[in-house]
A protein has these predicted regions:
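Short, mixed-charge low-complexity intrinsically disordered segments
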Residues: 62-97
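C-terminal motif of bacterial Sec signal peptides marking the signal peptidase cleavage site
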Residues: 12-15
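A short beta-strand micro-motif
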Residues: 21-32
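Positively charged n-region of N-terminal signal peptides that target proteins for export
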Residues: 1-4
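Bacterial signal peptide processing site
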Residues: 17-19
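A short, exposed loop/beta-hairpin motif centered on an aromatic-Gly-Thr core
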Residues: 35-55
Length: 97
């Protein structure tokens, strides 16, 4: 019984700590990429892995292209947070495509 409780406790703790570290940014028009102070308006969600983030962003771009005919762009940011020392900008530790 103690072992079962220990396993459940570990599973609960690991599920709490495995947060959504990746943020997807999708820009619907590649010819009109927003400035850094507007990037927060283009987030589409948070994901546990880069691969999930990338897949969601690409899917959104494809859907946007199908409805608007405009080519978009995306990036995935790792551990993004607003930084007061940068005027409240959303700053990521890393970005990838």
């Amino acid at each position: 019984m103690k072992i079962l409780l220990a396993i459940i406790g570990i599973l609960l703790l690991s599920s709490c700590s495995s947060g959504s570290d990746w943020t997807a940014f999708v820009y619907p028009d590649i010819e009109n990429i927003p400035s850094a102070d507007q990037a927060h308006n283009y987030t589409i969600g948070n994901y546990s892995t880069f691969e999930e983030c990338q897949a969601a962003a690409i899917e959104r771009i494809r859907n946007n292209y199908a409805t608007t005919g405009r080519q978009g762009d995306y990036q995935c940011g790792y551990k993004c947070s607003r930084r007061d020392d940068f005027g409240g900008l959303l700053i990521c530790k890393e970005t990838r495509k």
